[in-house]
Amino acid sequence: MASYHLSVKTGGKGSASPHADYIAREGKYAREKDSDLEHKESGNMPAWAAHKPSEFWKAADTSERANGCTYREIEIALPRELKPEQRLELVRDFVQQEIGDRHAYQFAIHNPKAAIAGGEQPHAHIMFSERINDGIHRDPEQYFKRANTKEPDAVAQKRHVSGKHRPNAKNTLLPRGRRWADLQNKHLERYQHADRVDSRSLKAQGIDREPERHLGAGQVQRFDTEQLQAILERREAERQVQQSRDERDSVIDVTTSLREALSERDTLTLKQELKSEPEQESHSGRTFDFEKEPDKLNALVSDAMKDIQEEIDLQSLVNDAMAEFQGIHQEMERQRERERLAEKQRQQEKERQRLAEQIRQKPDKGWSFSR
């Protein structure tokens, strides 16, 4: 099931190069076996780092101001439903949408196995520099110096100030989150997946449950069997509740066809009434000699048979509509019972989860992918 996650982080002087190695699985993070790296690439780099983006981040650590931001990172969860090449297409579209050709960037797609359920956890790390790319060639030292608006050729690019730890952080992050959700939904629709994501909080979506904390591999290893089972049962209960909602919605969709049937019945009735009026007018005050005008008799018989058939069809339509309505009512009753049982199971699991939380030694603070 597709899930929404977007967060923004910043890095200070000395942290860009190690973090770039981490997301690219290079340096001390390089692993020969069982790598979770699905893809990595970079763009908008100056000529001296075009083929080796690690040089760019090293220069940022060396030459950026002491209190400067060496990089900004957007971290996003990717839908499991999409294939690797489709996820890459999604990330590239997002990078083009949010960064374009304005900033040097590097991104990596990771796909580790979930610590509890063992499923895929595809996500992307997108690092970019706040320095705006103005097309002027500068060496590494000049690139990260304070911009000179009077002589832009002399020293570094201007910095784009936005996001976390800035006065307009909320105004930047929330619209970006909505854009990411919209783009992700477009790609899910493009590849014919029914799931959709929502950037709003669970409360804003009208979902009555607590958000689940992200659990790192180290924390999961400290859980006992009962704690792990409680988490899995909670997830299963939530899955059943969502399935019940989806099935209920599909039943509601069926009522649309019922309304259409009733509308069609009313239309047929109206047509019949309109048709009978001119016939009554034409037949009133006039008689036919059917022996001399057999065609008139045949026409009247044919019209009468059509009226009878329309009545039969109309009654059949009404009967079908009533049967469909009864089926809808019965199905909705079954859905209510399934939801009641699923809610009961969810409450039981929630209580077990609360007890498990009390004995947890080191609760996780915030969301962060561990791999």
Curated annotation (Swiss-Prot):
Coiled-coil regions listed: none
Alphabetic keyword roster: Conjugation, Mobility protein, Plasmid
Origin superkingdom: Bacteria
Location of region: Disordered: 1-46, 150-172, 196-221, 263-291, 328-371
Record field: compositional bias (Basic and acidic residues): 22-42, 196-215, 330-365
Transmembrane segments: none
Keyword Ribonucleoprotein: no
Amino acid composition bias (Basic residues), ranges on this chain: 157-168
Keyword Cell membrane: no
Family membership noted in the UniProt record: Belongs to the MobA/MobL family.
Known role: This protein is probably required for relaxation complex formation.
The protein's name in its UniProt record: 43 kDa relaxation protein
